[in-house]
């Protein structure tokens, strides 16, 4: 089987990021998954490329809620046709999906090779040990930070529609022993455009990322720390339901770039006074896109995205 998923209220980072997930079996028992995510240039939203000023998540384009593109090794042709018919650039999107599938298939193959070489029990044990090890290292770094509540505030220029209203962002980093909570209470309420952030797929992930980058950076650490779920375990994230970082469906949540960068920047700012050696200066905390599109003389649509950081 091959599953597609991009639903912003069910774990996806935002709707253009489509995940391809394939199961891995051992003796007909499910033991894991091979998965990847890719940003797709156009998924049939209200405007070509990327969007901001739209009323709800349905205007973001195709919402794929863990649907099967392959089942039992066979293509689910109606879904392939649906995707092809609902993007402005089917050649690009279908080609990228095929590449994702090939990547996931390679992951399944490599996983199966490990199982064949070492046996299921040893592979699963090793995976768990690696996650436990990374968790242990993350907790050890958190424990070096004095207990306390560390706060920082910032803002976003606007929601893409009402240019007269800035959006407050407030961060409180609560350190308690080997655990940390990032509390976003006081940040802007959700907005009526796509300038909201999927909580599970982006808000929480931004918090996981910033602590990994600050405390277990690959280049500054003295030893190799595996990248895995273990580093997430000591970190909790709190954002009031109905806020920009935890919107209520069906609010649009496609344009979530600047918000999570501002949030990460404020976490660093909050902790700067107590761990200055691991903190960076403030950054632009923004990401801008320019989307170009049109119709060729042949009648084919074209879409091009330029990313500026």
Where are these regions (language model features)?
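Glycine/proline-enriched, intrinsically flexible loops and inter-domain linkers
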Residues: 1-181, 185-309
């Amino acid at each position: 089987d091959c599953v597609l998923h991009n639903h912003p209220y069910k774990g996806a980072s935002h709707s253009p990021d489509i995940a391809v997930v394939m199961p891995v079996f051992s003796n007909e028992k499910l033991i894991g998954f091979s998965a990847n995510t890719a940003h797709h240039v156009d998924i049939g939203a209200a405007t070509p490329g990327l969007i901001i000023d739209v009323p709800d998540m349905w205007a973001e384009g195709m919402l794929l809620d863990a649907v099967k593109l392959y089942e039992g090794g066979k293509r689910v042709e109606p879904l392939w046709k649906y995707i092809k018919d609902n993007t402005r650039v089917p050649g690009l999107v279908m080609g990228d999906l095929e590449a994702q599938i090939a990547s996931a298939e390679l992951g399944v193959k490599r996983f199966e090779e490990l199982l064949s070489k070492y046996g299921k029990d040893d592979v699963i044990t090793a995976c768990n040990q690696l996650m436990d090890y990374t968790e242990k290292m993350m907790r050890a770094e958190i424990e070096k930070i004095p207990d306390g509540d560390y706060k920082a505030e910032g803002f976003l220029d606007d929601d893409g529609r009402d240019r007269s209203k800035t959006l407050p962002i407030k961060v409180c980093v609560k350190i308690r022993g080997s655990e940390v909570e990032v509390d976003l209470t006081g940040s802007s309420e959700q907005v009526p455009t796509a300038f909201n952030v999927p909580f599970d797929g982006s808000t929480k992930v931004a918090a996981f990322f910033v602590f990994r980058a600050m405390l277990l950076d690959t280049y500054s650490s003295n030893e190799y720390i595996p990248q895995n779920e273990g580093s997430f375990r000591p970190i909790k994230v709190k954002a009031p339901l109905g806020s920009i970082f935890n919107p209520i469906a069906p609010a649009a949540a496609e344009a979530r770039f600047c918000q999570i960068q501002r949030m990460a920047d404020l976490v660093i700012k909050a902790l700067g006074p107590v761990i200055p050696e691991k903190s960076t200066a403030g950054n632009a905390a923004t990401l801008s896109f320019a989307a170009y599109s049109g119709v060729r003389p042949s009648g084919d649509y074209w879409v091009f995205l330029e990313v500026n950081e």
